[in-house]
A protein has these predicted regions:
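Basic, polyanion-binding surface patches
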Residues: 1-164
Length: 164
């Protein structure tokens, strides 16, 4: 029998992760959406693939299920906690009011002063419990602020990278 969801979350909160804002553009409309995501990882350098895990209850899930949907992963710097909170807690229409946004090759919004970003098309997807894992093929990327330390999340709070 698997462990409880509560036990699972309790264990995983002890694993530090980077913080990203995943932004989505639906080709079926002009709707854009974004949410804070820590379930992000690299998959393959050839072809360049990454993954994000999105809850089925999220608006992002509905948009990513649209044929031809694209998304960007904006990797946040240590000075972007407020923006992370904005995309975690505010209503959809208020999220993009902060930050300066450009449009990536795929049409997904990219944060101009992100530490780094990856612009992706949906390569494949896998339903996994309450979430779907989206594999994104990276179409474009940049590191606008290479000297900035990343924003980290560990044990229910934001952390800064202090060791060199």
């Amino acid at each position: 029998m698997p462990i409880s969801s509560e036990s699972f979350r309790d264990v995983l909160r002890h694993f530090p992760s980077g913080v990203t804002i995943v932004t989505i553009k639906s080709p079926a409309s002009e709707v854009v959406h974004g949410l804070t995501v820590s379930a992000f990882a690299s998959v393959s350098p050839d072809p360049p693939l990454i993954l994000v895990s999105i809850d089925h209850r999220a608006t992002a899930y509905e948009l990513l299920e649209t044929a031809g949907a694209s998304f960007a992963v904006n990797i946040l710097g240590h000075d972007q906690m407020e923006l992370s909170n904005r995309f975690a807690w505010l209503k959809d229409e208020d999220r993009f009011a902060a930050g300066e946004w450009d449009t990536a090759v795929t049409g997904a919004p990219i944060l101009r002063d992100a530490l780094a970003w990856l612009d992706c098309t949906v390569y494949s997807r896998f339903a996994a419990g309450s979430h779907t894992i989206y594999i994104g093929e990276v179409q474009a990327s940049d590191v606008p602020r290479p000297d900035v330390k990343p924003l980290l999340y560990w044990n229910r709070g934001y952390r800064n990278l202090t060791a060199k």
